[in-house]
Amino acid sequence: MTLQTNQTEKFTLPDLGKIQLQNFYNFLTKIIYKELKAFPKIYDSEHNFEFKIYPEEFFLVEPILNERESIYKSITYSTELYVTAELNCIKNQTKQKQKVLLGHIPLITSNGSFIINGISRAVVSQILRSPGIYFGSQLDSNSKCIYTATIISESGSRLKLEIDDRKLIWARISKKRKVSAIVLLLSMGIKLSDITRSIEHPAILDNILKKKNVLSNQKDAILEIYKQLFSAGGDPNFSDNILSELQRTFFQQRCEIGLIGRSNLNKKLGLNIPDEEIFLLPEDILATINYLIKLSLGIGSLDDIDHLKNRRVKSISDFLSEQLKNALNKIENTIEQSIKNISKRKRILTPKSLINSGILLAFFKDFFGSHPLSQFLDQTNSLTELVHKRRISSLGPGGLTRRTASFHVRDIHPSHYGRICPIETSEGMNAGLVASLASNATINTMGFIESPFYQLNDSSLFDKPIFLSAREDENFRIALGNRLAIDQEIQEKQITPARYKQEFINTPWSLANLRSIFPWQYFSIGASLIPFLEHDDANRALMGSNMQRQAVPLLITERPIVGTGFEANIARDSGAPLISNIDGKIQYLDSEFIEILGVDKKTYKLKLSNYQRSNNNTCIHHRAIVQLNQWVRKGQILADGATTIRGELSLGRNILVAYMPWEGYNFEDAVLISDRLIYDDLYTSIHIQKYELEIKINHQGQDKITKDIPHIDKYFLRHLDENGLVTLGSWVEAGDVLIGKLSSQEREDSLKVPEGKLLQAIFGLQIGNSRDTSLKLPAGGEGRVIDIQWIFQDEGGIDSNNFVNVYVLQKRRIQVGDKIAGRHGNKGIVSQILSRHDMPYLQNGTSIDMVLSPLGVPSRMNVGQILECLLGFAGKFLNKNYRITPFDERYEREASRKLVLSELHKAKKLTGYPWLLEPENAGKSRLFDGRTGETFNQPVTVGSAYILKLIHQVDDKIHARSTGPYSLVTQQPVRGRSRGGGQRVGEMEVWALEGFGAAYILQEMLTVKSDHIHSRYDVLGAIVTGTTIKTPTTTPESFRLLARELRCLGIQINDIEIYHETLQKKEIEI
């Protein structure tokens, strides 16, 4: 998409998915070489053998399987890393040089995700405190203000310097221990005379040197730090071991600041130290001390830790670089061990035999499988996928935690504008900690977020945009308006809102240095899809942007009548449509392939996705939109995805809505819908479930796939073929066997089964050596079998298992209990489905599709839905689509309202329907009751709204249980739908029943229906025989558990019955 505001200005929106791809490209081209270059030469103990690699000769091999085949076969999509290695025998002066496989590296897909064991995963970028120096202030234990300087290393370790109210300067070694800053400087090798010369205020230094026992040489300083750091008692003697230990645990961890830290220190302290000097130097400490002294004297400024100039983004390349470094260290250790033992080996070693190629992939798989920021890719729809890859998180290793993060950290900062979206974030405990990049933001090589701006000067009014980080744009006046509002000759219009030094000001246009590019430059791609965004409360806009990510792809999608113009860009960059890579002519076309005859006379074959399952069980599907013999250009869309139409994002449907109460069925957030949505498949979605069966091979034998399953009704086996697999295309229902399987078991195990002992005792029979472990369709899984696949593992041997996957497709129509939502945070649950004849209808006889509550608008302040609804209504009659950019009010007061009313007026003139725009009730019209034919008392707001069906569906939520599993400890029903659990009668539920005096119901719920073991069996027998249910005489299991826990504390509880007549005691065991 391009925006052109005059003859010379043109700006193209960036590729929204390129951040991940560029970052991984940087890893492949630069970081791998850098880490291989750091790989040392390895010698044996006698220096007879030398092993080394040639980093400049590394290369990667193209994967054998493509992305789609890797998912289908449940393997990792990866490339092989080869490097030239050399083993020299120095004694014999012989050399062996070979190209060796160093290991496998997972590859990023064209969509910016990774495929690990057949599952798509996304790596979320992490935003952390940048390495460097930060000055702050805090109160000490005596409530006196002290100034601090925190130096953050590249690994995240911290070194803290502080100046107290007595003007003494300390270096904090740990939370509780500190040493004089002079001691730290002496330990770094600088002389006391040099320190005296470098301090700008000698009087403060004299104050420190007046103290007793001031150290004066490097060895004593190192011993002092060692004693404080390791709490060493006595007076340790200086040795090389102490020096190396201190070097490893203190100086290397806390003093390696890296390139970013060095740049940060140079800028803050005004130093000219080369960027290659990545370790902390004595000059840095001296400059820090001087700055602290100035702060104590009221000179200088403190740092804002939440400013984006002090935070950097840790991306894919940084994470993978760490794993590569660790893997190479392990490879180095294994080679070292092998070479050390070389004299004991009789066989001749080669470079290939020294390297274990499995180490590298093991490290990467461990990262992708266990790291909190390597996440299961959210594939509900194509927007969700793109947003997930553009997410940035403050959580994770080295970051914040959701429980300890303060409100200050979560809040919006002025430096976020144009870089991090102020609207889209998680709800709940992650609010403000997980955010989304703004639509035009990019991440530079140093990891800082940049935003584009236009320069405003006489020489080049509309030049190429410049990308600035938060540190660089701080001293510029950035105009937030644009020239359309400024060029008018009204004096008041010459003042424009601007951003300057973290403040929002009004400034003359002539004083502005930069201006923003797009109105939606400040928002994420999710928020950029909301039309009339400026008329919505920010909380509801947040919900709207989050709920668009939960919309399920529909069977029949539709473009929104009212959009923002951003839909096509998001659809294209999400990877959902199939795009041509060449110019050519469509030679062949069907539902599986498209063949293009290129201008070079070569044939290119492109495969379409056909009803494939996503990570969220939604459908990934392609529909060809080109025709046979059609000429196509490079970049042209050949096939639409499940959520695109003609390359434009389409997540929902435009339906006729009315804002009115209807018999209480749309009370609160309930929604009334017409049966037309069901019969015309307007909200029918496709869901694909995957059922997996493992075929084990162990010492007892191999599992057998067969149709002959004993003790199962033949009705449930009706879909199996002669091999025991379900037939493709079968309609299966709950309880049907999908794969028949018998697992072998030992004879002793079969006797442990109760019926085994019974059969043996009565008939002398022995039950079989196999048990039924068939794959059965669970409740609620009814559907059509669309695919069966076998997965054979490469490893042979006794414990290698194979898998069979069965894919079942469900077509779900909208029903009561499903969740629906608009784009403005207006969500609701379907409460009633009415016949279209009973629904209210317009004056031209058209029935309303959905009735929403009018009380959901004023209190929530999302008026954008009303403007969208009315403009969509006009577009429906005018057969027009609208693309509205936000903040149109800066051009003219009431611009949005005027646009809507003018379009309604055009629709009224075109159709001749006067009720489309009535002067006394603008935007409202009279509706008729479908049941009686009479008009309602009040005119009603009617329009066409874009409504989405969300993934929160009643089929996945509804659950019922009669009997099922019980918790072993409490003997109460387990929790959760997935485990077949039950409801728990808690404290408040007991109060509710007590309030109504329902004593018997309460007793049943707390005993026979819950955890009274013997009584619940008696109840079942009483129901079957029709006898009276006896009142339990003993205590339930939860009370017995309490008694046992009290016994652990030494408190004995006894239950004693005393008979009134004889006064005899009878003790009952609890």
UniProtKB/Swiss-Prot annotation:
Gene Ontology molecular function: any one: ribonucleoside binding
UniProt catalytic activity: RNA(n) + a ribonucleoside 5'-triphosphate = RNA(n+1) + diphosphate
Record SUPFAM superfamilies: beta and beta-prime subunits of DNA dependent RNA-polymerase (SSF64484)
Annotated PROSITE patterns: RNA_POL_BETA
Entry keywords, A to Z: Chloroplast, DNA-directed RNA polymerase, Nucleotidyltransferase, Plastid, Transcription, Transferase
Keyword flag Membrane: no
BP GO annotations: DNA-templated transcription
EC id: 2.7.7.6
Protein localization: Plastid, Chloroplast
A GO cellular-component term linked to this record: chloroplast
Main location: plastid
Family classification: Belongs to the RNA polymerase beta chain family.
Subunit and partners: In plastids the minimal PEP RNA polymerase catalytic core is composed of four subunits: alpha, beta, beta', and beta''. When a (nuclear-encoded) sigma factor is associated with the core the holoenzyme is formed, which can initiate transcription.
Function: DNA-dependent RNA polymerase catalyzes the transcription of DNA into RNA using the four ribonucleoside triphosphates as substrates.
The name this protein goes by in its record: DNA-directed RNA polymerase subunit beta
Gene expressing this chain: rpoB
